[in-house]
Amino acid sequence: MEIFVKRLKELRKDKKLTQMQLSKATGLTASAISAWENNARVPSAIAIITLAKFFEVTADYLLGLSDI
């Protein structure tokens, strides 16, 4: 999950969003986003899809299965 953690942080920071702002924009909890970014929890499939749609990337990209 380290690739997911890295890519989530990069995508969020590229959009200049705080964890709270990302939470409000996606409907995901700020505590969950924090836990994912600290590699303390594994996101659900629904959360991964939600993040992928928000950032306009594929779930495969978020998970490190593709570089596009």
Predicted stretch roles:
Residues 1-14:
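A short, Lys/Arg-rich alpha-helix, primarily the initiator
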Residues 12, 23, 52:
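The alpha-helix within a helix-turn-helix
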Residues 13, 27, 38-40, 67:
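Residue-level detection of the helix-turn-helix DNA-binding "recognition helix"
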Residues 32, 42, 61:
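Residues in the helix-turn-helix
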Residues 37, 47, 63-66:
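DNA major-groove recognition helix of helix-turn-helix
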Residues 46-61:
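DNA major-groove recognition helix of helix-turn-helix/homeodomain DNA-binding modules
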